[in-house]
């Protein structure tokens, strides 16, 4: 009788591990990655909002899409990833002391790496974007808020 319960428990444990159920160590790594993503986005926002860069009105005329629904799960990071290439191109339009192309590329590569790690093997999610677009500063602010929300739910 107990054998069946034990075997059921083992089977369930193996199924959870095989399907990537979060463990305490993976949650700790996820928290570190979310925190790192948050810091990278905040640093990028600081550079975009720099008064010297605000003079470059072209950079602030481009529109970015944000998810239609409130982004609340790590799978929503796919939406950030899809708009990141455009953001990189826009930031490269206005090179300055604060936004040199090499720093932008390094920053974007780091953000992409973190997002891909946080997404894991989830590829089936399709982003649905809001009809209303936002400027670069609001775009970054929305994703910073997303990271803060995810981080606070994990602590």
Swiss-Prot record:
It is found in: Secreted. It comes from the Eukaryota. GO terms for cellular component: extracellular space. The keyword Cytoplasm does not apply. Keywords: Adaptive immunity, Cytokine, Disulfide bond, Glycoprotein, Growth factor, Immunity, Secreted, Signal. GO terms for molecular function: cytokine activity; growth factor activity; interleukin-2 receptor binding. Its main location: secreted. Disulfide bonds join 79-127. The keyword Lipid biosynthesis does not apply. Glycans are attached at residue 23. PROSITE patterns: INTERLEUKIN_2 (PS00424). It holds the Pfam family IL2. InterPro entries: 4_helix_cytokine-like_core, IL-2, IL-2_CS. One of its GO terms (biological process) is positive regulation of biosynthetic process. Residues 1-20 form the signal peptide. Belongs to the IL-2 family. Cytokine produced by activated CD4-positive helper T-cells and to a lesser extend activated CD8-positive T-cells and natural killer (NK) cells that plays pivotal roles in the immune response and tolerance. Binds to a receptor complex composed of either the high-affinity trimeric IL-2R (IL2RA/CD25, IL2RB/CD122 and IL2RG/CD132) or the low-affinity dimeric IL-2R (IL2RB and IL2RG). Interaction with the receptor leads to oligomerization and conformation changes in the IL-2R subunits resulting in downstream signaling starting with phosphorylation of JAK1 and JAK3. This is Interleukin-2. It comes from Boselaphus tragocamelus. The gene is IL2.
